[in-house]
């Protein structure tokens, strides 16, 4: 709903709950504690099959030790605020999760924790990323932008798509080589015909 469609209409199902992690982030009420910031959204998050995290368990899982839970948000570093922002998205229990370039601002350990979480995530996940390693860990289908407004769907992760492109390129080279070989095989025949025609012409003369 942040952008109006160029054409047509968007109909969202009644049970669809979006979670959107943006590059811009959000502005926190920095007077609130870390735990209050999460509990204001939800106290329990569901994941996997019949599993739940409480707000404090989710914080601990994402490397906010219990000693930090009563700490005001104003004391957090920039990286910690990005991590807390991620948790505000996850704790909203979305069944359609959108992650916009998450590897740009999150540290390696946070990304590993996020990957672990997404492995058990049962909803629809849409990731915008240039990080092929993160894509390999989290997605099983790609939308590839080919330019000129063309988008191609591919079933598989990034490495599988890369292998597909390499094999397609090899097939193209084999086809070109085969076509060149056909041309070489045809050329001597035509040349012999031309020579015979010239000899026959001389004998005729």
Annotated model-derived regions:
Residues 1-205:
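ABC ATP-binding cassette signature C-motif
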């Amino acid at each position: 709903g942040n952008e109006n469609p160029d054409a047509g209409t968007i109909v969202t199902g009644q049970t669809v709950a979006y979670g959107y992690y943006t590059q811009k982030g959000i502005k926190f009420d920095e007077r609130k504690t870390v735990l209050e910031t999460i509990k204001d959204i939800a106290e329990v998050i569901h994941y996997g099959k019949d599993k739940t995290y409480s707000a404090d368990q989710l914080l601990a899982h994402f490397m906010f030790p219990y000693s930090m839970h009563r700490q005001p948000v104003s004391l957090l570093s920039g990286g910690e605020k990005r991590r807390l922002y991620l948790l505000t998205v996850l704790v909203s229990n979305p069944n359609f999760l959108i992650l916009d370039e998450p590897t740009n601002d999150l540290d390696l350990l946070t990304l590993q924790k996020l990957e672990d979480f997404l492995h058990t995530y049962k909803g629809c996940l849409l990731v915008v990323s240039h990080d092929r390693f993160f894509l390999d860990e989290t997605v099983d289908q790609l939308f590839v932008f080919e330019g000129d407004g063309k988008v191609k769907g591919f079933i598989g992760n990034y490495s599988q798509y890369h292998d597909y492109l390499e094999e397609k390129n090899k097939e193209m080279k084999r086809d070109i080589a085969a076509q060149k070989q056909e041309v070489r095989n045809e050329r001597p025949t035509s040349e012999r015909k031309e020579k015979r025609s010239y000899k026959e012409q001389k004998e005729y003369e």
